[in-house]
Amino acid sequence: MEEFQVYLELNRSRRHDFLYPLIFREYIYALAHEHGLNKSMIFFENQGYGNKFSSLIVKRLILRMDQQNRLISSANDSNQNPVFGHNNNLYSQMIAVGFAVIVEIPFSLRLISYSQGAEVAKSHNLQSIHSIFPFLEDKFSHLNYVLEALIPHPIHLEILVQALRYWVKDASSLHLLRFSLYEYCNLKSFITPKKSISIFNPRLFLFLYNSHTCEYESIFLFLRNQSSHLRSTSSGVFLERIFFYGKIKYLGEVFYNDFQNNLWLFKDPFIHFIRYQGKSILASKDTSLLINKWKYYFVDLWQYYFYLWSQSGRVRINQLSKYSLDFLGYLSSVRLNPSVVRSQMLENSFLIDNAVKTLDTRIPIISLIGSLSKAKFCNTLGHPISKPTWADSPDSDIIDRFVRISRNLSHYHSGSSKKKSLYRIKYILRFSCVKTLARKHKSTVRAFLKKLGSEFLEEFFTETEEEHVFSLIFPRGFFAMRKVYRGRIWYLDIICINALVNHS
């Protein structure tokens, strides 16, 4: 029992984080501004403070929040406060900006301490989105079933605030956060309005949501490690691809006795868990009975331990050989590649049928064309159209934008098993560029191409980056070169999915 208590208890040193005094430090807000932690920064230009955050304003604001009878009480959030010259929404955003920076300090320090160890070289590659696909190639081809679960969103902000009680010890910071949420977000019901979230700092909401998700994942990993025949090794830190700073192997005050009677339900030595944003994926080699037990475990865990309503329909179970997993811009499935081997023993020869399982990654061409259609590069059928909003730009800028989008898509989808869909996307972008230029010069597409020649826009058909790299290694006439071109290539430098359009 002592062994489980050591595993379950939080590290005491991590709970001695008194964050409330940092709210009154002006350099916290300067740090948020200088490092660009929030794109929609708020500046206070009155009272002679200049374009900067002032700790004096923060002190006055917090003191004013504690008073029951405030000087100004307005039913309309758009009315300005004559004391500061800004509305109440700006106050909530100001507190959120500072608090978002402050609560991330303990995680940043812990991440720095881990980076000084020997595991940092192994963890760097986990920052790339593509790092998950080599793992899928190695593991998923041997598995049978996959469970997809949409993580339910907290229906009340109090759940998100309570998720921080394991990381932040002083109650003043939590009370201030709770008060600002209820005071300025105007939460009158258990269902959070979308408008209330939009006025609050999205970075802080993202941090609170990831803290809540990390808590239930820690319980899941604990049960998985205790039930598995082959204990998985818990790493000190796991770099989330985009949003979260770290995952720690310790979890909150959960008692082992509550779970030990149920561990026998989940015996499975081959089980893998992946989460990205709001989706969790659980893959198993065992029978459908076991994966169904995990399904009801997820639903019960969310409802009874985290008070989140989750319907069983949000958790789907599929067989990998008959289902394509829509994940991170790829349709992944397990494909059987049949092969026939001729064997001869003495004078007798016979044929042996052998099927090899491989991971097949394809581009979701329909959804990708839908994204291009929303960005006004083509219609819903995939026919290229002009981009009128870019027609006022210089020709070089128009070509550069289209070429950059084409190369970004080619770079990200370089791991596709079939490249024909990618060639169709390049075709759409190329002729959308031509139609945009023809629209600008008030000409037809045929006349415009005839005037500039066939060498125009050759950037769209130049060799890709991976082809250029391998051309420096292998001779052009080498036979293996063609196989290399058709192979999947995963890059470990992609840390985010680039938007199709960077400029409006």
Curated annotation (Swiss-Prot):
InterPro entries: Domain_X, Maturase_MatK, Maturase_MatK_N. One of its GO terms (cellular component) is chloroplast. One of its GO terms (molecular function) is RNA binding. It is found in: Plastid, Chloroplast. GO terms for biological process: mRNA processing; RNA splicing; tRNA processing. Keywords: Chloroplast, mRNA processing, Plastid, RNA-binding, tRNA processing. Belongs to the intron maturase 2 family. MatK subfamily. Usually encoded in the trnK tRNA gene intron. Probably assists in splicing its own and other chloroplast group II introns. This is Maturase K.
